């Protein structure tokens, strides 16, 4: 079903069964598969391919040569009808690839809203990306990676499968991330190691001076006290009782499966 207010360029191919929302724009030489839903106001610039059981929300901008919802690169994939869901107001730049999920990973790759994925960024099968994140040019997420809100991943950085990137994290360019990166942390290198708290990012997002100080104190307990993480955890938990922002650390401890970067 194509809304009467949607624009479909004469050279675009929209297969029967696709749903195109009001005021959507499907540019020249785009291909939209039969199980795709494209929301109101979303723009496919040109030469964009959207395939599979893919739902794209409102007011997204998808640039030329992006491949969205294509078959994943997991060798176990046998053609199951897995899915990709993308939220609203994302900017997906040239040649970005976002693959649909696998049965083994829950069958869903999911992207939130208000993200920027720069040129050649890759989001593999079964990833979960939150909202207001940035993946810089050529940043790569392997399968099953989770990226929490407001995270920034630098150019040419690769994140190992099943890793978790916490909220407000900033990872420098050309890094290799093989373990989980806790919230608020700046990380860099191959293998990525912590370099402090993302203070400037927290200021920009309205964190108070008191909250930032508490986060820094928790970071020091984890990384600068000479204690093991297990030894530091009770003290971080005690700090979290006084400062709600620190609870992000204690909650992250429970989620982590690959261990924290050290």
From Swiss-Prot:
<dbReference type="InterPro" id="IPR011004">
    <property type="entry name" value="Trimer_LpxA-like_sf"/>
</dbReference>
<dbReference type="InterPro" id="IPR001451">
    <property type="entry name" value="Hexapep"/>
</dbReference>
<dbReference type="GO" id="GO:0008780">
    <property type="term" value="F:acyl-[acyl-carrier-protein]-UDP-N-acetylglucosamine O-acyltransferase activity"/>
</dbReference>
<dbReference type="GO" id="GO:0016020">
    <property type="term" value="C:membrane"/>
</dbReference>
<keyword id="KW-0808">Transferase</keyword>
<dbReference type="InterPro" id="IPR029098">
    <property type="entry name" value="Acetyltransf_C"/>
</dbReference>
<keyword id="KW-0963">Cytoplasm</keyword>
<dbReference type="Pfam" id="PF13720">
    <property type="entry name" value="Acetyltransf_11"/>
</dbReference>
<dbReference type="GO" id="GO:0005737">
    <property type="term" value="C:cytoplasm"/>
</dbReference>
<keyword id="KW-0441">Lipid A biosynthesis</keyword>
<keyword id="KW-0444">Lipid biosynthesis</keyword>
<keyword id="KW-0443">Lipid metabolism</keyword>
<dbReference type="InterPro" id="IPR010137">
    <property type="entry name" value="Lipid_A_LpxA"/>
</dbReference>
<keyword id="KW-0677">Repeat</keyword>
<dbReference type="InterPro" id="IPR018357">
    <property type="entry name" value="Hexapep_transf_CS"/>
</dbReference>
<dbReference type="InterPro" id="IPR037157">
    <property type="entry name" value="Acetyltransf_C_sf"/>
</dbReference>
<comment type="similarity">
    <text>Belongs to the transferase hexapeptide repeat family. LpxA subfamily.</text>
</comment>
<dbReference type="Pfam" id="PF00132">
    <property type="entry name" value="Hexapep"/>
</dbReference>
<protein>
    <recommendedName>
        <fullName>Acyl-[acyl-carrier-protein]--UDP-N-acetylglucosamine O-acyltransferase</fullName>
        <ecNumber>2.3.1.129</ecNumber>
    </recommendedName>
</protein>
<dbReference type="GO" id="GO:0009245">
    <property type="term" value="P:lipid A biosynthetic process"/>
</dbReference>
<keyword id="KW-0012">Acyltransferase</keyword>
<comment type="subunit">
    <text>Homotrimer.</text>
</comment>
<comment type="pathway">
    <text>Glycolipid biosynthesis; lipid IV(A) biosynthesis; lipid IV(A) from (3R)-3-hydroxytetradecanoyl-[acyl-carrier-protein] and UDP-N-acetyl-alpha-D-glucosamine: step 1/6.</text>
</comment>
<comment type="function">
    <text>Involved in the biosynthesis of lipid A, a phosphorylated glycolipid that anchors the lipopolysaccharide to the outer membrane of the cell.</text>
</comment>
